[in-house]
Amino acid sequence: MSFVSIITPSHNSVQFISVTIQSVLDQSFSDWELIIVDDCSTDNSVEVIQSFVEQDSRIKLIRLSENSGAAVARNTAIEAAQGRYIAFLDSDDLWLPDKLEKQLAFMQANDYPFSYAAYDKIDENGQVFGHIGVPDRVCYSDLLKTCSIGCLTAIYDTQYFGKVSMPLIRKRQDLGLWLKLLKKTDYAYGLNQTLAQYRVRTDSISANKANAAKFTWRLYREVEGLNLIKASYYFSHYAVRGLLRTKAPGLARRLGVLK
């Protein structure tokens, strides 16, 4: 049984999946399993993944029978996971080599069941162009206002929570999971050290922003069950903070919206 189970959904990820897997293989902490769930890819990413599976028994590939979306893919991996800790890494993102070692030490030294970390933003060529710092801790209501937890950095302890799955929505399912966890504990704790790299794809930036807003509203209303007044209150925080981070990052930093 591995100590950490790494959850990676994959769909037509041939362009970046090799470097993503390699970033896991390069970890200084080695007691992990990487569970990749392929969501009916039509490129040759499955063949690429399989080549890694054949080289390292810690890497596992599960193939879905029909295209089902990232939430189903991640939940399938969570169900198959055997590790105490559940970590997340998407198929185009990267971990720095000491990510697991530092973050697990942070959690165990402080008895934290749920943690996250700072990360850099990279472009399609792997060049760093931005940085996302994190607050020391967040609670449920904090996260409704703005999601400070990057999926590629999140880790939770199944000894504390059990296995907790993502809500079955097409977008923002990661935020939905963090909210579920924060109903079971007071805080998630942030390690403000850069431990990962989030890849921003130029072909989907505008669409992602629009979809994120739409599905954030749906998450408030349909998953969290917030009434119209509460949902509007939290959505206004989400929208204003997002606008400040994008259009006025200097002001956002002074206000504590952008670390």
Features from the language model and the residues they span:
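Short loop->beta transition adjacent to catalytic acidic/histidine clusters or analogous donor-positioning motifs
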Residues: S2-V4, L25-I36, N44, D56-K60
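Glycine-rich, basic loop-to-helix element that forms the pyrophosphate-binding segment
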Residues: L64-A81, K102
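Short aromatic/hydrophobic "clamp" motif used to bind/position activated sugar donors
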Residues: I86
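A conserved acidic beta->alpha catalytic loop
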Residues: S30, D38-E47, E66, D90
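Conserved nucleotide-sugar donor-binding catalytic segment
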Residues: E79, H131-F215, L219
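Acidic helix N-cap motif at the loop->helix transition within catalytic regions
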Residues: Q15-S18, D43-S51, L94, D98
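Conserved donor NDP-sugar-binding/catalytic core segment of glycosyltransferases
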Residues: D98-F129
